């Protein structure tokens, strides 16, 4: 008899977890497209395996050695960064991070809502991350003065997040529709792990928000259990949830491509959001 997780896996049509055992993280590109930001790129030109093994020893030559080695002007226009610096009185830094951003739907929705925040999508899949970056460039060209604050990069967030962000740098961090890794033997690949929660807390400032959402109940329960056990986070209250514009977006199921798919299929999602509280991660 199939378990509920196996039924869910079949219903969603996800590839079998065994398919991603030996993924060459640089050799997985199926189609190459050089859009150069002239028009909105087409997703079909950026085909990609659905899964990557985050525990594989890939090659990540572009990973900064420390946050101060990361160049924001490699992703955002220098003039826009200078305007933010003038307004804020300090160097502009990324404050929102979408981990496993997929095709960047959330970034596009957040951009006009938070025009003064630098928003970064972080994606492990090479072609998908390239799509997000080119999509951002194309949107800037089609809408002058808009979408200046979003971009995407390729990285393994389970290994390198502190290489990009200083302690307390982020205001918001999103984990939306992460790979479920259904098999018990593969669950250590899930993005929310007890050992990693301290890293996420390190990057979030006190009062910052961590958002999780999934269409797999077992994964939702897993993430909630891990975060409930952490002394560095507390669940958002009902009042806080009702007042949060990001929660409103996520409840409607419209900001991400995966969320739109679930909504079209009349599926359910599990949303759990947490506030970073006082306390020092063990670093």
Where are these regions (language model features)?
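Class I S-adenosyl-L-methionine
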Residues: 223-283
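Conserved SAM/SAH-binding beta-strand->alpha-helix loop
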Residues: 125
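Conserved S-adenosyl-L-methionine
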Residues: 100
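Conserved beta-strand signature within the Rossmann-like core of class I S-adenosyl-L-methionine
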Residues: 206-214
């Amino acid at each position: 008899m199939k378990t509920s997780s196996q039924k869910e896996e079949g219903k969603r049509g996800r590839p079998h977890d065994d398919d991603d055992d030996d993924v060459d993280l640089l050799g997985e590109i199926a189609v190459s497209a050089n859009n150069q930001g002239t028009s909105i790129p087409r997703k079909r030109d950026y085909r990609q395996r659905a899964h990557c093994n985050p525990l594989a020893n890939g090659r990540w030559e572009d990973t900064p050695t420390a946050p101060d080695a990361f160049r924001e002007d490699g992703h955002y226009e220098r003039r826009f960064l200078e305007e933010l610096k003038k307004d804020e009185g300090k160097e502009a830094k990324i404050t929102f991070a979408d981990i496993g951003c997929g095709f960047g739907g959330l970034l596009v929705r957040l951009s006009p809502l938070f025009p003064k925040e630098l928003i970064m999508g972080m994606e492990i899949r090479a072609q998908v991350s390239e799509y997000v970056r080119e999509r951002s460039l194309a949107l800037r060209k089609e809408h002058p003065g808009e979408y200046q604050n979003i971009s995407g990069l390729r990285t393994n967030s389970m290994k390198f997040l502190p290489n990009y962000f200083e302690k307390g740098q982020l205001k918001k961090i999103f984990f939306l529709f992460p790979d479920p890794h259904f098999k018990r033997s593969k669950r250590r690949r899930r993005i929310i792990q007890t050992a990693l929660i301290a890293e996420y807390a390190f990057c979030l400032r006190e009062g910052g928000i961590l958002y999780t959402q999934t269409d797999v109940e077992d994964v939702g329960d897993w993430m909630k259990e891990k975060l409930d056990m952490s002394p560095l986070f507390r669940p958002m209250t009902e009042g806080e949830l009702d007042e949060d514009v990001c929660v409103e977006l996520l409840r409607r199921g419209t900001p991400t491509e995966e969320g739109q798919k679930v909504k079209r299929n009349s599926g359910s999602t599990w949303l759990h959001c947490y506030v970073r509280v006082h306390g020092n991660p063990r670093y």
